[in-house]
């Protein structure tokens, strides 16, 4: 962190240490979010951040805890600046902790700049609508819930579901179409266990995923304030690569539930009045300051796309965290415990998932001309198959017509062959759409009401490769 141009001031007196908070006497000129140095009697220095200022006291969140701080001999120095991240193009291929410090054994970053981790809001008049397709290599996303550059599309998961494996797969496989386009992934693991942290680190290293990626890892035993800072630090790096180096950046943030739990813990320590289920009333606004940093800006070649991942407590999609996230973001990808128990990976619940901006990123020149019709037909056929599956439980399959049994066959194969794919299997959008046509061939042609006749003649396996094509 650069030295501040402002004079460093010392707090006159420390009043109390509580949890991870340090309470100091009020001091004129101290501002919210200001970085502080806590100097212990031993000479050790810890970073902290001002989280509340009042007439009676200044409350400081300390990185590293306050249990061993002697209030009589320790000092607090106010730096007169907010938390800044040293950024450089050399961050690509590196792994950092929750405060942006290298943890991969490599040399320190030689910064091109120091950027405020809170960023600056994008002028709404300067925003460009998301419109270009990002290929993740996962059929359930690319074919049916396409993500486009500048979008924010979360994954709603549950405890025990394979969201970490999916996140690692997307980091390995994601790319943009077009040889001249520069693409990078910024990955942030928030409050994960040591085992999960090692899974991500080893996975990225072993499969070469770090070549065009930056990883920030925050473990569960790190200070709470780090979990508040890490998504902002990751997005600061993403914005630097996008706006300064014209890269299309996909930012994956997992697990945002841990972030919200840290927000609740910090709110309780400050003795704030709780809102729904104990979370602070400003959680919606706080989440918006993170999610709204995605987008495309007029006059800039790069873009920031967000894919936050969160676990729904008790698989409850009405819980405040997924509920508020859904209000801010542009759709959701929902993981299904039922499909996971069937042995299907990745277990995306197609009927519960939605990408609101998909229509702007598919079609001729973006994916393929038949994409819209294929995804509508697959949705329709799968929904009908699920409905008939429930009916068959009551009346038995023998009572169903030949048409109905075709839809049952389609639904079963759709889950196994289209939604399901290998953890290290990457499908191009063309392979995904061709796989969709293979499954649609199960149904009679007169049932394909959502696809154009000319697309049937061109892509249907019955006609594919014939001269009429």
UniProtKB/Swiss-Prot annotation:
Classification of source organism: Archaea, Thermoproteota, Thermoprotei, Desulfurococcales, Desulfurococcaceae
One GO MF term attached to the UniProt entry: ATP binding
Protein species of origin: Staphylothermus marinus (strain ATCC 43588 / DSM 3639 / JCM 9404 / F1)
Keywords for this protein: ATP synthesis, Cell membrane, Hydrogen ion transport, Ion transport, Membrane, Transport
Family statement: Belongs to the ATPase alpha/beta chains family.
Subcellular location: Cell membrane
Membrane topology category: Peripheral membrane protein
Record function comment: Component of the A-type ATP synthase that produces ATP from ADP in the presence of a proton gradient across the membrane. The B chain is a regulatory subunit.
Protein name as it appears in the record: A-type ATP synthase subunit B
CDD domains: ATP-synt_V_A-type_beta_C (cd18112), ATP-synt_V_A-type_beta_N (cd18118), V_A-ATPase_B (cd01135)
Keyword Membrane attributed: yes
């Amino acid at each position: 962190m650069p030295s501040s141009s402002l004079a460093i001031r010392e707090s006159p007196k420390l009043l109390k240490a509580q949890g991870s908070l340090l309470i100091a006497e009020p001091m004129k000129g101290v501002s919210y979010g200001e970085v502080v140095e806590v100097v212990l009697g031993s000479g050790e220095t810890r970073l902290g951040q001002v989280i509340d200022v009042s007439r009676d006291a200044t409350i400081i969140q300390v990185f590293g805890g306050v249990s061993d701080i002697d209030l009589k001999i320790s000092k607090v120095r106010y730096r007169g600046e907010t938390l800044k991240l040293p950024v450089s193009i050399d961050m690509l291929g590196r792994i950092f902790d929750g405060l942006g410090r290298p943890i991969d054994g490599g040399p320190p970053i030689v910064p091109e700049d120091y950027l405020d981790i809170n960023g600056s809001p994008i002028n709404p008049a300067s925003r460009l609508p998301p419109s270009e397709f990002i290929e993740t290599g996962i059929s359930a996303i690319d074919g049916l819930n396409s993500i486009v550059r500048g979008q924010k599309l979360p994954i709603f998961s549950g405890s025990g579901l394979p969201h970490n494996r999916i996140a690692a797969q997307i980091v390995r496989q994601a790319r943009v179409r077009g040889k001249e386009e520069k693409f990078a992934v910024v990955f942030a693991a928030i409050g994960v266990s040591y085992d999960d942290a090692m899974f991500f680190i080893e996975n990225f290293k072993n499969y070469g995923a770090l070549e065009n990626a930056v990883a920030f890892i925050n473990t569960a035993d790190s200070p709470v304030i780090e979990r508040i800072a890490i998504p902002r630090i990751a997005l600061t790096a993403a914005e630097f690569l996008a706006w300064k180096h014209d890269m299309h950046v996909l930012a994956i943030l997992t697990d945002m539930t841990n972030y919200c739990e840290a927000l609740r813990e910090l709110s309780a320590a400050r003795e704030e009045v709780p809102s729904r289920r104990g979370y602070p009333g400003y959680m919606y606004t706080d989440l918006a300051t993170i999610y709204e940093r995605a987008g495309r800006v007029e006059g800039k070649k790069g873009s920031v796309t967000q894919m936050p991942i969160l676990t729904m407590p008790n698989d409850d999609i009405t819980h405040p965290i997924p509920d508020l996230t859904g209000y801010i973001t542009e759709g959701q990808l929902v993981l299904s415990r039922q499909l996971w128990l069937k042995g299907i990976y990745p277990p995306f619940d197609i009927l519960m998932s939605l990408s609101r901006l998909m229509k702007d990123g598919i079609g001729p020149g973006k994916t393929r001309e038949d994409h819209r019709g294929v995804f509508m037909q697959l949705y329709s056929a799968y929904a009908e198959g699920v409905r008939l599956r429930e009916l068959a439980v009551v009346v038995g399959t023998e009572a169903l017509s030949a048409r109905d049994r075709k839809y049952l066959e389609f639904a079963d194969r759709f889950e196994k062959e289209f939604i399901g794919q290998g953890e290290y299997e990457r499908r191009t959008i063309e392979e995904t759409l061709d796989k969709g046509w293979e499954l649609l061939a199960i149904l009679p042609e007169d049932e394909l009401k959502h696809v154009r006749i000319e697309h049937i003649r061109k892509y249907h396996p019955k006609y594919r490769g014939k001269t009429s094509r």
